[in-house]
């Protein structure tokens, strides 16, 4: 079934349902623009769900003199704490001192800059030097030679839920969000883009748009190739970053930032209560972004570094999960993959009567997505007539809470059957949206597919969050995939198959 013409042209057609695409969609829709997002798979199905899950200034970027990026990221850290208090949580980072890698004075200077580039906040205490004693949480799991260190603040985030809630906000503001929909053909008449969209269901349609935003992430160059823009040349540098997940191997709810002899750093962060996430790597990548996977060399690299710092040795047998993402970085011709800028760059063309406006996006990071979107709309203002930003103060869906801990207590009081752990999961994932699918009695929640994933929550994810498959639900909406066994996953799949579409 094909529909060749859609009523009025969209102001923006955005290719890519990652964090940059949905961030731009939300901002644009809130300015009154008519917006469509086209995502070939699920929202956040590529790079945006495979990050280190941090909202941070990027301490190591100071070594590359990227002061503008760090200042902007630290400012955005504060903004995201305010607009997404359910998703973004303060986290303390412990840096064990390795004097032969970086002298103490250098680290102190870096942390001083980090503290002072940021806005002062009671929620994010400043840095300080600490002793890594065997009788405290910071030093207990480390090898005895690590006696001194530093501690500073940053934040942690559920990256894929950040994408989902931006898409939800965009949709509430009038944007059309199409998932599992591929842009199979793109043409123009000099003034308008014509885009053929083919959906997984077999349906297809042709839409028109005044502006095309290429937010395709690792596929950004492929879109430019299709549009016959060979001048993109070496603008894109794909860098793979991989992570592993293991059972939590240290006490406390802090994270570690570990220095390696290759001058890189690796994080070990608490993940989903009983696990720790270790990453990332930086490896130049030339393959198909859809087929990216962690290599044996990356696994060895991460395990080797952890084992150099911690008493309890880890091996491949400890791994419960891993993932890899491809960062679509702007190629600044830096030698090593780890030194390539994480800043974003726009390529704006058209609007001259010969080609409609095209905006392609390179680089960026989860932390700065909101500012990237705001900046993109500023770039497009001469063509849209909409120049006023609004997203720095408007909370994301579910964000009308003070803190997840406090809201979890409210949920427990309101729904007597809730356990503290489940109430906190709901508070962190949904904030005050949890009320939309919670029932007074546990029986009304429907089937428990395992680990307190009830049919009521599953239905919400399908109806409100574009979820269609078990992977959508278990890995990108709830992160319960770490806990589900094969039988539980099959039971959920059976429910999805039988559910009316």
Regions found by a protein language model. Give the residues of each.
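Glycine-rich FAD pyrophosphate-binding loop
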Residues: 29-50
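Core beta-strand elements of the Rossmann-like FAD/NAD(P) dinucleotide-binding domain
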Residues: 8-10, 202-211
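Beta1/beta-strand and adjacent pyrophosphate-binding region of the FAD-binding site
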Residues: 6-18
């Amino acid at each position: 079934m094909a529909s060749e013409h859609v009523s009025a042209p969209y102001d923006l057609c955005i290719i890519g349902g990652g964090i940059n695409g949905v961030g731009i969609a939300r901002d644009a829709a809130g300015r009154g623009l008519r917006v469509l997002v086209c995502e070939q798979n699920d929202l956040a199905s590529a790079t945006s769900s495979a990050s280190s899950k941090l909202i941070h200034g990027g301490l190591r970027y100071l070594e590359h003199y990227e002061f503008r990026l760090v200042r902007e990221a630290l400012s955005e850290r504060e903004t995201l704490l305010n607009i997404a208090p359910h998703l973004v949580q303060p986290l303390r980072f412990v840096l064990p001192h390795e004097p032969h890698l970086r002298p103490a004075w250098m680290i102190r200077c870096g942390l001083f800059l980090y503290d002072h580039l940021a806005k002062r906040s009671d929620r994010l205490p400043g840095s300080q030097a600490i002793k890594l004693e065997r009788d405290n949480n910071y030093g207990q799991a480390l090898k005895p030679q690590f006696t001194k260190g530093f501690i500073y603040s940053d934040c942690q985030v559920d990256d894929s839920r950040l994408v989902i809630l931006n898409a939800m906000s965009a949709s509430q503001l009038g944007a059309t969000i199409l998932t599992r929909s591929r842009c199979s053909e793109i043409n123009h008449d000099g003034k308008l883009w014509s885009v053929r969209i083919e959906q997984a269901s077999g349906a297809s349609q042709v839409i028109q748009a005044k502006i095309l935003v290429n937010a395709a992430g690792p596929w950004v160059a492929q879109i430019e190739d299709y549009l016959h823009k060979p001048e993109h040349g070496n603008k894109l540098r794909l860098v793979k970053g991989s992570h592993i997940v293991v059972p939590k191997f240290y006490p406390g709810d802090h994270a570690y930032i570990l220095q390696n002899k290759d001058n890189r750093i690796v994080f070990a962060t608490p993940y989903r209560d009983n696990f720790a996430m270790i990453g990332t790597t930086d490896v130049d990548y030339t393959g198909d972004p859809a087929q990216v996977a962690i290599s044996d060399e990356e696994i060895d690299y991460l395990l080797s570094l952890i084992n150099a710092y911690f008493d309890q040795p880890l091996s491949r047998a400890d791994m419960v999960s891993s993932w890899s993402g491809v960062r679509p970085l702007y190629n600044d011709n830096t030698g090593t993959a780890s030194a390539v800028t994480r800043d974003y760059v726009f390529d704006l063309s058209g609007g001259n009567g010969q080609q409609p406006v095209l905006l392609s996006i390179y680089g960026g990071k989860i932390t700065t997505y909101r500012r990237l979107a705001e900046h993109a709309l500023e770039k497009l203002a001469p063509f849209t007539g909409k120049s006023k930003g609004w997203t720095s103060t408007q909370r994301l869906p579910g964000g009308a809470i003070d803190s997840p801990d406090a809201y979890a207590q409210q949920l427990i009081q309101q729904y007597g059957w809730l356990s503290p752990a489940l109430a906190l999961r709901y508070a962190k994932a949904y904030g005050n949206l949890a009320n939309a699918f919670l029932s007074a009695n546990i029986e009304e929640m429907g089937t428990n597919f395992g680990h307190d994933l009830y049919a009521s929550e599953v239905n919400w994810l399908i109806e409100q969050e574009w979820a269609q498959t078990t992977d959508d639900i278990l890995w990108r909406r709830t992160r319960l995939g770490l806990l589900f066994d094969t039988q539980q996953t099959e039971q959920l799949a059976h429910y999805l198959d039988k559910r009316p579409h």
